[in-house]
Amino acid sequence: MLLKDCSIVLISTAATNIGLSNHELICSAKAGIEGLSRSAAKTYSRKNIRVNTISPGLTRTPLSRSITENTIALKASEKMHALNRVGEPKDISNMIVYLLNKENNWITGQNFIIDGGLSTTK
């Protein structure tokens, strides 16, 4: 059964927009996700399927523990963000909920950078 009248949110990374040392693999993979999102938004618009991407900055998750549980690394990372902190899962999930809401049905093919100002400080 094909989907229709729904929303898909893909996850990229803010690093694709600024270029960070030692992030070549994730940036190249996530840039592909952004292209997929834009193309899928166009392809599936006829089924009223909206496709968007969010690009978070560093967010406190199990995957980022090596940074967020290391005091020195955490302080350095916080300084990279204009809001002087790393993101929390709720910072990201709020935007996902917004994009999935059927009331917001005029948004498709977009990439939303949710990075606490990381991309503005580089």
Which residues does each predicted region cover?
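Active-site helix of classical SDR
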Residues: 29, 37
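Alpha-helical segment proximal to the catalytic Tyr-Lys
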Residues: 42-46, 105
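Short, flexible catalytic-loop segment of classical short-chain dehydrogenase/reductase
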Residues: 51, 56-66
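A conserved structural motif in NAD(P)-dependent oxidoreductases
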Residues: 81-92
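A short C-terminal helix-loop "cap" of Rossmann-like NAD(P)-dependent dehydrogenase/epimerase domains
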Residues: 67-81
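Active-site "substrate specificity/gating" loop of NAD(P)-dependent dehydrogenases
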Residues: 19-23, 45-46
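Residue(s) in the substrate-gating loop at a strand-loop-helix junction
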Residues: 13
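Short C-terminal tail/terminal secondary-structure segment
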Residues: 18, 97, 108-122
